Amino acid sequence: MKTITAQEHKQILDIRNESLSSLPPGIFEKDLLLTQALRHLASTDSEGMGLVFCGGTCLSKAHRLIERMSEDVDFKLVVPEGLSRTARSKRLSQFKKRVVLVFQEAGFHVPPEQVVARDENSYVAINLLYESRFSPVASLRPEIKVEFNARPPVLPTAPLPIRSMLAELIADRADDFQIECISVDETLAEKVLSFLRRTAEVRAGRNRAEYDDRLVRHLYDVQAIVAHHERLKSEPPHAHFAALVAGDAAQYRNQYPEFELDPVGQMRDVLQALHAQPDGFERDYLQFVDELVFGETVSFAEARSVFSELADQLLGSMHSV
């Protein structure tokens, strides 16, 4: 089963011994293996599929806008146009099998039950199991989750260099590699929508899985994006946000019909709860910051304020779109 090398193990211990970081060794270990999984994907023949890195891990590793551990790897898939529904599903299935094989050949353990596919393979989640050489970290899951969504990016993408937290800390650029990445603007719109729609889904009792108490990460991430790109305060991606909302409404119409009928109302209810019933959100946020943020911390009040202001602008523009 996949594990870090003896040299990597020593480097992680040296970081702790030299007081370069107070983070548990298991966090560096998981990030290192996650980065290696990314490297294998970047060098894989995607057989005509466009592969675009996105999400919080992209913000951390590629755009370098957030200083937190992100243990999920998210990708958008660009499927060739002109395929029939059957051909599209088959093409996505072939890609899924190919990627699983790539991870297995890299040493990760991928049991069949750890591969989930929905919507004719338009959504695929793969859990990569590895052997840890350190004590478990309570805040981390024991697997690396890789998700693929066959919804292409709308805004232009760009290749960016990727490196591990370990390499970043010791200023080692020798093993950098590039991967196509989603834009910051698109990420901002997705994070606002993800927090609002997924929280609203739970409040409506329409969630398939248990509530993800780390959804509050989107508040932290949005604040970090705006801190580095202040233009987004006055120029948020209105049109793109509206397109994303329409896409989610269509994708989840069977699971969450209320969202298709009134997406703005459902999301505004969450914004109101964020201020009127903040206790649960603040508890989750403080725990998230304590366990996974290794850079400068941001208070719940500040993150909520920045997020709410942006979300309010984006939702307000929906009535005129």
Where are the language model's segments positioned?
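Structured mid-to-C-terminal alpha-helical surface segments
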Residues: 1-51, 63-67, 78-321
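Glycine-rich beta-strand-to-loop/alpha-helix junction loops that act as flexible
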Residues: 53-57
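Nucleotide phosphate-binding site architecture
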Residues: 60
